[in-house]
Amino acid sequence: MYKLVLIRHGESTWNKENRFTGWVDVDLTEQGNREARQAGQLLKEAGYTFDIAYTSVLKRAIRTLWHVQDQMDLMYVPVVHSWRLNERHYGALSGLNKAETAAKYGDEQVLVWRRSYDTPPPALEPGDERAPYADPRYAKVPREQLPLTECLKDTVARVLPLWNESIAPAVKAGKQVLIAAHGNSLRALIKYLDGISDADIVGLNIPNGVPLVYELDESLTPIRHYYLGDQEAIAKAQAAVAQQGKSAA
């Protein structure tokens, strides 16, 4: 049996402000830093260790990983940074308040943009300052692979090559693997691992800063999965994530 640990970054400044973030490189709040440290403590207390870690190229995930490594005294563990683990690109919604957007377009439309499998938000214009083309962290990524908007289906398509070519082989080689990433890049991976349908993926909500453990068989098919920590608090955090895209009315 193999184990794989996933963690969504701690609360970011735009999580706190209930804004669509996507590829915008915002940092953690103090609460987010605290969540990440607590995640590291939980993992250490539960006896976990890691041989390699994967994260995105966005600081909220990177800093979360730093905190986890620090708490576990694993700062030496090699880290793979990949744009393929970035959050889903929210296109023209990037930076907008989720509740205000829902009040303008309706809860149903915003739910479709946030959680449907194959409907992306409106795209950025190529010349928009939020477009990734001029960002040095993507200098080696072919321009045609860089998105101006994404649905979850698109996110799955960019996450899976990293899983198939690097993460899965590491797990099968017996390495203890940690992935510190984002709500939708993790939803994309979980959809693939658990075989969740396009319709049912809408209901999957991942809380910030809580370690999610997957136990996998020899073919990397999930046997079971579970969150570490206070289960009641985790359930409340998942419910809060589900409420983010609804209007205040």
UniProtKB/Swiss-Prot annotation:
The keyword Isomerase applies. This is 2,3-bisphosphoglycerate-dependent phosphoglycerate mutase. Keywords: Gluconeogenesis, Glycolysis, Isomerase. One of its GO terms (molecular function) is phosphoglycerate mutase activity. Its EC number is 5.4.2.11. (2R)-2,3-bisphosphoglycerate binds at residues 8-9, 15, 21-22, 60, 87, 90, 98, 114-115, 182-184. It is an enzyme of class 5 (isomerase). One of its GO terms (biological process) is gluconeogenesis. Catalyzes the interconversion of 2-phosphoglycerate and 3-phosphoglycerate. The gene is gpmA. Belongs to the phosphoglycerate mutase family. BPG-dependent PGAM subfamily. It comes from the Bacteria. It comes from Burkholderia pseudomallei (strain 1710b).
